[in-house]
């Protein structure tokens, strides 16, 4: 499997494009100078485009991906707020942008050539909205709102319009601050990391009714941790066996084993990582994790033990200034 890793560094306005080798080694393919502070990235489902959010002029850039994984800018469109998170629906027809500071979610069309157009809908009043996440059925968008301690749910219509889902929201404990999400491959469970108390919530999805219920909440930090909690990112291995969460104050990656049915997490350990790990990701084989240090100007690659989920550091690589986002593409 040929894989490419994209690392966004807003302070130097760059995307570094790396080839990921079979042993976890990285080879630099390209350094892209971006017209703006690049932050969130999303890969199109058909793997032909990379969508990038930039500021201070709030825009989304569409990059064409060639057969090697290299990028060529192909389009630009405006966004209503500073982009905090980008995602698409599973068919690649619509781009969703969450804006934390703008307290909004927007929907933009993606044309037949894979280029994002101007927004067609804007939902306001979502305080601290931190991400938009399409569910496995491609029908419901989950929008964690950190300042509201709740996840809002929206139905996705045929032309991209979002409307309030029958179950309008799920609430967290007070002060948790829901942020980023991941879905289990079996499509029956979702996981949300809470930024302000560094916990993770497990949600069960009822495919028949569309209802959601919280079934577990677990602390991600070591016992006795007394510093400020500041969780950031969450990802799950493709086989659904392991889940990881990053905390920026502690510069740690928390390791969880997932029960066979996906319903239960067990915290098994912690791995020190790059300073202030705001973003990380897992490759498509489930063998490697790439962590970005927002304050270290480096990324680090780890091998994932397939029996325990433990992380073995392999190598560090210098990138741009303030790296915040990691995306991984499987070319074949």
Curated annotation (Swiss-Prot):
Pathway in which this enzyme or protein is active: Carbohydrate degradation; pentose phosphate pathway; D-ribulose 5-phosphate from D-glucose 6-phosphate (oxidative stage): step 2/3
Key word Hydrolase present: yes
Enzyme class: hydrolase
Organism domain of life: Bacteria
Pfam families, alphabetized: Lactonase (PF10282)
Reactions the enzyme catalyzes: 6-phospho-D-glucono-1,5-lactone + H2O = 6-phospho-D-gluconate + H(+)
GO BP term, pick one: glucose metabolic process
UniProt-listed Enzyme Commission number(s): 3.1.1.31
PANTHER family: 6-PHOSPHOGLUCONOLACTONASE (PTHR30344:SF1), 6-PHOSPHOGLUCONOLACTONASE-RELATED (PTHR30344)
Chain's role: Catalyzes the hydrolysis of 6-phosphogluconolactone to 6-phosphogluconate.
Record NCBIfam families: PRK11028.1 (NF008258)
Similarity section: Belongs to the cycloisomerase 2 family.
Protein name: 6-phosphogluconolactonase
GN (gene name): pgl
